[in-house]
A protein has these predicted regions:
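Active-site acidic/histidine proton-transfer and metal-coordination neighborhood
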Residues: 3-10, 96-197
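Residues at the N-termini of beta-strands
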Residues: 54, 118, 224, 278-279
Length: 315
């Protein structure tokens, strides 16, 4: 591993710049424990069988949390960890720093123990996924923005100092940071040494942001990628009916590549042009899903993405 991601490898005369991995999300996993989800052993088996090497931890508690146990399970399948995931609500101020830290510490400890170098940080959503009711305003006032920026700078500093991990902020549907102006404001008001983007191409498209524009205008702030696509016809329906993120997924808003938007060939070309190693983790949001559905999609997506770039690998 290097400071910014996977160690570059050589294929002929060119360095590999984008390393493709996958995540529990692509197997329909949103929660630590849910009988509707693929069992973790089957997930790991199918990831390896599908030809991937790198994975994310997914929701804390889905995979074994004992480092020795998890390390043995990964080694047996030739798998490695790129990142863990935490959730925050710093815009709410008050005790949110303390509230976020305990779960973040657990994820950071496990991620670092597995050799990962990144923590993907997802902001709280402003409406309930089940009922669709707003749990708070969908917009932030100036004080809330300030709390959000300060909280993430503090989190990034602790992750770096205590665990050697990099904070990759994940703009998210139904959160306060999803649209392009909000992403740009976040980048302007946070320390690039403490926070960069986990650019999720599907969430960006869903929220009306341009992945290509963000890569081209903020190349130094692209720290990590989630690769996915959106079905534009279903997205139009989602917007017309004001669906929640969960309802949109049930409606099929996520599209198996290459059938949706954005054009991942263009995204991968732009990312390879950054000329530094970076992870691109495949995410196919489809909770809940039958156990036999994810692996064929994961295999087809892997093969497609590897065809998109001249310096893209799974190793």
């Amino acid at each position: 591993m290097t400071e910014n991601g996977p160690a570059p490898q050589r294929s002929g005369s060119a360095q590999n710049m984008l390393t493709i991995g996958t995540a529990p999300d692509s197997w329909g996993v949103w929660f630590a424990d849910d009988p509707a989800q693929t069992p973790w052993q089957r997930f790991l088996d199918e990831v390896a069988e599908s030809g991937y090497t790198w994975i994310e931890l997914g929701p804390y508690g889905y995979l074994p949390t004992d480092p020795a146990h998890l390390a043995d399970e990964l080694k047996a399948r030739g798998l490695r960890v790129s990142a863990g995931t935490v959730f925050t609500a710093f815009h709410r101020g008050g005790e949110q720093g303390e509230t976020a830290w305990e779960p973040a510490r657990k994820v950071a400890e496990l991620t670092a123990a597995m050799g990962g170098e990144h923590i993907v940080v997802i902001p709280a959503m402003w409406r309930d996924d089940v009922t669709g009711e707003a749990v708070e305003s969908g917009t932030l006032d100036e004080g809330q923005w300030s709390d959000l920026f300060a909280g993430h700078n503090r989190l990034g500093a602790v992750l770096a100092a205590d665990f050697g991990l990099k904070q990759q902020f994940h703009p998210h549907a139904d959160s306060h940071v999803g649209a392009q102006p909000d992403i740009e404001r976040l980048l302007a008001e946070t320390d690039p040494d403490l926070l960069n983007l986990c650019l999720d191409t599907g969430h960006a498209e869903y929220c009306g942001a341009s992945s290509l524009d963000l890569i081209r205008r903020y190349p130094e702030r692209i720290g990590y990628l989630h690769l996915k696509q959106i079905n534009p016809e279903i997205l139009a329906r989602v917007r017309a009916e004001n669906m929640t993120w969960a309802a949109a997924n049930l409606a099929g808003v996520m599209s198996e590549p290459p059938g949706g938007l954005p054009d991942l060939r263009e995204v991968i070309e732009a990312v390879e042009g950054l000329n530094r190693p970076i992870f691109g983790i495949v995410e196919q949001d489809m909770y809940p899903v039958g156990f036999d559905v994810p692996m064929p999609i994961a295999q087809r997506t892997r093969n497609y993405l590897l065809s998109c770039g001249s310096r893209t690998t799974v190793r």
